Amino acid sequence: MNKYKQYFASDFHLGAPNYDSSRDRENQVVAWLDFIKDDAAEVFLMGDIFDFWFEYRTVVPKGYIRLLGKLAELSDAGTKLYFFKGNHDMWVFDYFKKELNMHIISDEMEMERNGKKFFLHHGDGVGNGDSGYKLLKKLFRSKVCQWLFARAHPNLGVGLANYWSSKSKLAKRKEMKFEELELNWIKSLEVSLTQKGKKFDYFIMGHRHFPMDVKIGDNARYINLGEWINFKTYAVFDGQQLRLEHWKPES
């Protein structure tokens, strides 16, 4: 089977809000990966795949065996895998690289596929503004913060994280609506990059949890990948067109 497509997904938030809900979602993600494995040249997991993740030197959070096993299967079959650090799983280090041959992306990634240019980012703290969050993100990613957290016993550190996951507001969200003002930041980013001589066809991100595919600038498109608690959306590029699609188990 010819592997020629690029697939993009984000915000699985595995671990939230509880074990049963997360396991059901993990099974659906695995079914989706199984569905795309024959034609997937590359799979981009674009942040907040886990509601929490921290790699101690010799310990990783337990669980997610089905997902990791399926990713290993894809990697062994020649599919390239990319993991973007999100705001919930920014403490991914080298475990996935060693075990899954996965490329770990800390911030943005710029690439070209079949003549189309892509700007990829989880979506947190990108563009102008949001200086408070950017400072907090820098603090959490610092070696000092990571060292301090690693001093806590995994039962305490992961236990606290799981407690906060159980309070996830995302799982309780019933209705969302799109506001045009929410596009100002991505429009500003597109203009800023264009002024620097960088033109992109697609800006693909997650983080904001609302699936959308809208035109920005002259010819660019902004695709938000949504999330998998309420929407189960993903994007696929077949070398000609990029589409935002909904995963249905019966598909």
Residue ranges of model-derived segments:
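Core catalytic region of metal-dependent phosphoesterases/phosphodiesterases
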Residues: 2-5, 9, 14-113
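N-terminal short leaders/motifs
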Residues: 51-74, 168-200
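Short, flexible active-site-adjacent loop segments at beta-strand->alpha-helix junctions, enriched
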Residues: 87, 108, 117, 122-125
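Conserved beta-sheet core of the metallophosphoesterase superfamily
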Residues: 101-103, 119, 124, 128-136, ...
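Structural motif
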Residues: 113-114, 237
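Active-site-proximal loop/helix segment associated with metal-binding centers of metalloenzymes
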Residues: 123-188
